A protein has these predicted regions:
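N-terminal module-boundary/linker segments of secreted carbohydrate-active enzymes
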Residues: 1-32
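Aromatic-lined carbohydrate-binding/catalytic grooves of carbohydrate-active enzymes
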Residues: 26, 30-139
Length: 139
């Protein structure tokens, strides 16, 4: 049986107005059981909405540590996290997983010429240091 994608994305409601506390609270809300109309206590995750996606504003655009020609990647191609609003992305991902949620975030390649050429900014087998996450070039 085919089901449509189900989950929550930060951009749809908050745009750039996000921070770690807000996203962690959203995660907690997705697993909170509530009773509606006298029925059995149910959470959004019980209904299949178990994916949380952080869209934009986790990265440090315009960082002084950014590589020449880049907006938020260092010289090795690693994204630079905005530690003011997301002090610990690993803790946030761990929190999602402790709640049995899946989580992810939007990562765009830079510069635009690389995107146009369908090139990978980083080594395709690079493993993110804070989470076992592989970055691959899209098809």
């Amino acid at each position: 049986m085919c089901r449509p994608p189900r989950g929550w994305r930060s951009w749809n409601l908050y745009g750039n107005n996000v921070n770690q506390s807000l996203i962690t609270g959203i995660m907690d809300g997705m697993v909170k059981k509530q009773t509606f109309g006298g029925g059995k206590p149910t959470s959004l995750c019980d209904l299949g909405y178990c994916d949380v996606g952080l869209d934009d504003h986790w990265q440090m655009c315009g960082s002084p540590d950014a590589a020449p020609g880049m907006h938020y990647h260092d010289k090795d191609g690693n994204p630079i996290v905005n530690k003011v609003v997301f002090p610990d992305l690993k803790a946030m991902a761990d929190h999602a997983h402790s709640l049995k949620l899946t989580s992810g975030w939007c990562e765009l390649r830079e510069p635009r010429a690389g995107v146009a050429a369908r090139a990978s900014l980083t080594d395709p087998l690079l493993v993110c240091r804070w989470q076992q996450l592989r970055l691959f070039r899209p098809l």
